[in-house]
Amino acid sequence: MRHGRGSAVSAAISGLSPAKNSPFPQLCNVLLVASLSKTLSQSGTRSLDANSIPISEPVVLQILRRNSIDPSKKLDFFRWCYSLRPGYKHSATAYSQIFRTVCRTGLLGEVPDLLGSMKEDGVNLDQTMAKILLDSLIRSGKFESALGVLDYMEELGDCLNPSVYDSVLIALVKKHELRLALSILFKLLEASDNHSDDDTGRVIIVSYLPGTVAVNELLVGLRRADMRSEFKRVFEKLKGMKRFKFDTWSYNICIHGFGCWGDLDAALSLFKEMKERSSVYGSSFGPDICTYNSLIHVLCLFGKAKDALIVWDELKVSGHEPDNSTYRILIQGCCKSYRMDDAMRIYGEMQYNGFVPDTIVYNCLLDGTLKARKVTEACQLFEKMVQEGVRASCWTYNILIDGLFRNGRAEAGFTLFCDLKKKGQFVDAITFSIVGLQLCREGKLEGAVKLVEEMETRGFSVDLVTISSLLIGFHKQGRWDWKEKLMKHIREGNLVPNVLRWNAGVEASLKRPQSKDKDYTPMFPSKGSFLDIMSMVGSEDDGASAEEVSPMEDDPWSSSPYMDQLAHQRNQPKPLFGLARGQRVEAKPDSFDVDMMNTFLSIYLSKGDLSLACKLFEIFNGMGVTDLTSYTYNSMMSSFVKKGYFQTARGVLDQMFENFCAADIATYNVIIQGLGKMGRADLASAVLDRLTKQGGYLDIVMYNTLINALGKATRLDEATQLFDHMKSNGINPDVVSYNTMIEVNSKAGKLKEAYKYLKAMLDAGCLPNHVTDTILDYLGKEMEKARFKKASFVRNKPNNNNISS
């Protein structure tokens, strides 16, 4: 110490024993703490003399509590005190204080060594300190050290408070360490089944059961991470334990999880179990509004919008008032299943009941309205959204721009995009991707490449969707050399080099001689004829079995009789297709190969090169790639149908179902198109009827496909009824719909009907295209023929009368 002052103080104090000889023990401690604090702050522990400093627990605690001393020097002092053993050992209070310092200052790497010293000193870690340590370690991501603390407590034979384990589980879930949380949970559940004997021979059950809050957090985490098998394992394990009881929130989580994963039977059985529990334990254990929201969401996912609407009507008179989430879920479900009239009705009721629609609700309504070809109504809805002060998002404008492009309003879409760019608002990478795709559709590749360059300049990353659209455009126009241009314009990231390497590798594989091991073996073996398609979409017996209700006692006091009836049904039919249509590019981290395969399938099939597409498909099958999307199978099946290879198309469909790839609306469009080409409009109608009865829906492409099939089969009355049905369901006919009705009526000789549809088309503001011109030429010739025929009949009639006279 400087100038010898410290040594003098130490010498003075060393001659005293604060506990016995000194009449001023507190003053001695104060002087000693001040001296030690100054020494530690200036030179650390190297100037301390163990023989001259009387260390006691009060002194150590005051040093550790001093805010003026650096935490690392406190830690050094704490370790320096080890050298005083066996004369001095740290107490539990001292360890608690140093642990608090370590946790507060982030020196958590010292925890394992401190625990080892604690064990040597024979000091036990208390419950409170263990919880603080665990929380700090988990927050800092030091999961191994946290497990070390748990092991340390178990070695001591100390049974931790269940709340400690609950906090650990919750913290791990929030840190997305679900595997670690699962291992701890199952370890706790195994320990809860263990039995031990006390001195009197009684059996003691070790209570390590986690709380419902921690379990609920874990189940939510597993659901969000799409860990289906782990979710089911936790659910079944807890259901099998008599001492663990699910609460209402647990049931709601499980209903939502099983429903979203396609297990409607499990979701309905859980609802039934909740109702039974409420009859025994009271209404507090029964379904609440969140339960009904989850069930309505599940029914909408299964395409059972009709059932969801009935449950909603029951809900309104059952004492459970619909909330904002209820309306949002129903509007989303109706918009996705093209029930726009129902969606707008619910939207109106939502406003009438005092709920304010948010951006998500308006986005769903805008998307559904534009897909239903109601451009004017969509624009009016957007204006209302702005007037009511609901903030539009990038997604809102993306829906508008994409909808304008798809409804033949490309100029309006480009104008809106340019206005947003000038303002510097509501434009993201998806907006650029949508506009770039439209430019590629129109063949304006130079503009698309410039747009990509601008996209990078503005700091947006160019995604695989945009690049694949450009590649398809290059191949369609034969611009093979333009692929290298992407390297100049897209400079950031490794995406473009990976795409070009993938392209070069596939082209080299396609040039290799094909293996002859599978010669004369069908690539897509079929299990039947394409005309046997009804067996694949389910039989009427399946639908009937779902309608059979198991015997149940009618509860006149039930608030949800229809929901009770659904819950008592067995073997609910699986949905025939998913509401979401398969995308060519999903742009997921693990789907690069499949995305690129779908892109090049589109390229080869658009050029009519079916053999090259089949070879590419075979290469990937040989590589063991099985996670193909519905887009892959739909593309292959559509090409075979167009070429008239119906048996092979059936084989593609069989392989699709064997690989558990869910069909979508595009799959059934191809099926109906194939049946129409085979002249079996009756089967096409039957497939569509079965589809709608089992929860399916029709989009405008499906309507157009079936109208065309019925018209070519001269079933004009049914085609007309379907056309009217489309309009009554809130879907405006497009140019393809009108062209089809004009053509089939013209060819059937119903010229007045054809002219009526032409006038309706123009009155609706639907712009004709080049196909319309061709059909109108044919209609004009037929009308001219009819005019000549009528005129010749009028001329011949007087002549015949003169001859007879």
Swiss-Prot record:
Family: Belongs to the PPR family. P subfamily.
Keyword hit for Repeat: yes
Protein name: Pentatricopeptide repeat-containing protein At4g01570
Domain of life, source organism: Eukaryota
Annotated PROSITE patterns: PPR
Keywords assigned: Repeat
Alphabetized InterPro entries for the sequence: Pentatricopeptide_rpt, TPR-like_helical_dom_sf
PPR repeats: 91-125, 126-160, 161-196, 211-241, 247-277, 288-322, 323-357, 358-392, 393-427, 428-462, 463-497, 593-627, 629-663, 664-698, 699-733, 734-768
Keyword Repeat carried by entry: yes
Coiled coil: none
